[in-house]
């Protein structure tokens, strides 16, 4: 069976995302508790994550930098997700606000990476 249609679907699509994390165990705990992500370790300095749609990894050797790309996650229940982020030790850096098409908030994870979560109105 040919994989050409599958490869065509994925051509030029974002395929993998890497984020810095000095404490791999802590980011695994945080993202597992808040978003239900699964992980696979590749030695002591790297773990990959699977969110059910997009894969990525956390790299202990990279430094957090400000002003990079903003990763935006989707939630069916924004308030519940915000509460889980707080409970798991994330820091809300921009409270929920409305924008054309929905609402979102921004947070930093235990490694200091800034992400956002959005929902439809």
Question: What is each model feature region?
Answer:
Residues 38, 57-58, 91-95:
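A short linear hydrophobic-aromatic micro-motif
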Residues 49-52, 107-110, 120:
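Active-site beta-strand termini and strand-to-loop segments that position acidic
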Residues 11-56, 103:
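Core segments of cupin and vicinal oxygen chelate
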Residues 59-60, 117-121:
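Short beta->alpha transition motifs characteristic of CBS
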Residues 1-26, 69-71, 120-121:
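N-terminal beta-strand motif that seeds the catalytic metal site of vicinal oxygen chelate
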Residues 72-114:
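Vicinal oxygen chelate
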Residues 54-57, 112-114:
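Short, charged/polar, Gly/Pro-enriched secondary-structure boundary elements
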Residues 3, 57-59, 68, 75-78, ...:
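Residue-level hotspots at or immediately adjacent to binding/recognition sites across diverse folds
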């Amino acid at each position: 069976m040919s994989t050409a249609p599958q490869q065509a679907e994925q051509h030029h699509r974002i395929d993998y995302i890497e984020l810095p994390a000095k404490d791999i165990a802590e980011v695994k705990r945080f993202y597992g508790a808040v978003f239900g992500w699964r992980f696979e370790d590749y030695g002591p300095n790297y773990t990959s994550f699977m969110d059910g749609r997009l894969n990525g990894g956390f790299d202990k050797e990279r430094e957090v930098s400000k002003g990079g790309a903003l990763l935006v996650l989707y939630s069916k229940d924004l308030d519940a997700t915000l509460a889980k982020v707080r409970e798991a030790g994330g820091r809300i850096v921009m409270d929920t606000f409305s924008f054309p098409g929905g609402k979102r908030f921004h947070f930093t994870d235990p490694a200091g990476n800034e992400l956002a979560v959005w929902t439809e109105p």
